[in-house]
Regions:
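Accessory DNA-engaging acidic/polar modules
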Residues: 1-135
Length: 135
């Protein structure tokens, strides 16, 4: 008798695109150099993120990511993705997983790259930011 088998649907990695003003941005490390090179024109090496000024360019990137096995979310309302830390707190790990970052008088404010990064930041002592959007 043959053992029962079933197809396991491989879980696709999801990338969150954020609308920041006129830009759409996301942060993701790609093992696939071919995919990274295809998106290289949109990579901001100073901020370690991909930026799209035009909807057409963003949509082309979305198609490329889908073909490469990624899902995506488009986020315009940043609520729930922004965390804050006191100015004196260690923040390197949180910064690493953020898409954008601002310093205020007594705190550092981060837009995290996805909800998993938000949860990790909360575990490291950050709190959800409830103020007006700074990004």
């Amino acid at each position: 008798m043959q053992a029962n088998t079933f197809d396991v649907i491989e879980r696709r990695k999801c990338i969150t695109f954020f609308k920041l003003g006129k830009l759409w941005v996301f942060k993701q490390f790609f093992d696939n150099h071919e995919l990274f090179n295809a998106l290289l024109d949109y990579y901001n090496k100073d901020l370690y993120r991909f930026e799209f000024k035009y909807i057409g360019a963003r949509n082309n990137a979305l198609k490329l990511l889908e073909k490469s096995g990624f899902d995506y979310d488009l986020v315009e309302d940043l609520k729930g993705y922004v965390v804050q830390l006191p100015k004196h707190a260690k923040y390197a790990q949180i910064l690493k997983n953020s898409v954008a970052f601002k310093e205020a008088a007594n705190e550092r404010i981060f837009l995290m790259k996805d909800l998993a990064a938000v949860e990790e930041a909360l575990g490291l002592g950050a709190k959800i930011y409830e103020g007006a959007s700074l990004f």
